Design a protein with these regions (language model features):
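Conserved, mostly hydrophobic/aromatic
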Residues: 19, 61, 96, 123, ...
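Non-cysteine beta-strand/loop elements that form the S-adenosyl-L-methionine
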Residues: 18-22, 146-155, 247-250
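A C-terminal functional module that forms or caps the active site or interfaces directly
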Residues: 203-249, 253-257
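Glycine-enriched alpha-helix->loop->beta-strand junction motifs that scaffold or abut catalytic
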Residues: 13, 58, 115-121, 142-148, ...
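Active-site-adjacent beta->alpha loops and helix N-cap segments on the catalytic face
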Residues: 70-85, 102-107, 129-142, 204-213, ...
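Active-site beta-loop-alpha junctions enriched in small/polar residues
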Residues: 22-26, 66-68, 98-102, 128, ...
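Conserved N-terminal beta1-alpha1 strand-loop-helix module at the mouth
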Residues: 1-63, 68-81, 85-93, 264-287
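Conserved anion-binding
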Residues: 97, 101-198
Length: 287
């Protein structure tokens, strides 16, 4: 089974929540930090507890590599151990690496993150050097069932600086990117009807959601922007099709849910689970 079909099936079974393991050392409850003063062990212990508590209610996990690179080799060892544990648990893994280079460099990125210790099911990519920046990843999609999520329209305030610029034919840049990815993705459709070439589609501008979903009908979405950035569950539903076709990321909202509860630090993993369930149910009620 290809990874896009695995992800589709996981959404159908567990809901749309993508737990973002964007873990900083400062997120660790004090008792856990004292128990694991070593950065590698502390980060992994926290991640493992979050994974164990959310595995049955999370469609997938997104691991942002920068949070681990920031701590040097200790952080990268924690990253590797986290990916290995997710593979052991047969969870769908999105490595949030946002690579965007070309030629041999892109070939090395593809090899690094689709094989070996950094192996993930999906990775995130930036398309702004052109479609040839995606080419080195395509053999892994075709031959190994891997997948990518390419930036289309992001949820940050600065997205308007480039993504919203008009092109010569009046379309915005992100419209052009989305259509090019949809066309490219037709050659990599899973049995579920969605392509292994997915897109990152922020949910903070829902007024265009129905049109986007109609045009990009075979593009599976990784959807940021829920919660703190203003995206609502009722908006997210507009980016889905027949209750599937996208996963919704939450990182700090889940990882730091314990900070909103009295004595939550002692039960940080349970608090994360409760928040993931709340988020899942919030989205489902609008489907």
């Amino acid at each position: 089974m290809s990874n896009i079909d695995k992800l589709f099936a996981s959404v159908a079974q567990k809901g749309h929540v993508c737990v973002g393991l964007d873990t900083d050392v400062t997120y660790l409850p004090e008792a856990l930090a004292q128990q694991f003063p070593n950065i590698e062990d502390g980060l992994f212990a926290f991640n493992k507890a979050i994974i164990d508590s959310t595995l049955d209610v999370s469609a997938c996990y997104k691991v942002q590599i920068a949070y681990y690179e920031a701590y040097g080799m200790a952080g990268l060892r924690a990253y590797c151990r986290t990916l290995a544990y997710l593979r052991e648990k047969q969870a769908v893994i999105i490595a949030d690496i946002k690579r965007g280079d070309i030629a041999k460099t892109a070939e090395m990125y593809a090899k690094a993150h689709f094989t070996g210790e950094f192996e993930a099911d999906f990775i995130t990519l930036s398309p702004y050097m052109g479609l040839d920046s995606l080419s080195p990843y395509l053999p892994y999609i075709k031959d190994n069932g891997k997948g990518v999520f390419v930036l289309i329209r992001t949820s940050n305030e600065g997205a308007k600086d480039i993504e919203y610029l008009p092109t010569e034919n009046g379309m915005r840049v992100y419209h052009v990117v989305g259509e090019k990815l949809q066309t490219l993705g037709k050659d990599y459709l899973g049995e579920c009807g969605y392509s292994a070439i997915g897109g990152v589609m922020g949910c903070t501008h829902p007024d265009e959601a129905a049109e986007i979903r109609q045009k990009l009908d075979t593009t599976f979405f990784l959807i940021p922007g829920y919660g703190a950035q203003g995206g609502k569950a009722e908006d997210i539903a507009k980016y889905l099709r027949n209750g599937n076709g996208g996963v919704v990321n939450s990182s700090r909202g889940i990882l730091l849910a314990y900070r909103k509860q009295e004595n939550g630090a002692a039960n940080f993993a349970d608090c994360a689970r409760a928040e993931a369930i709340r988020m899942r149910d919030d989205i489902r009620k609008w489907l």
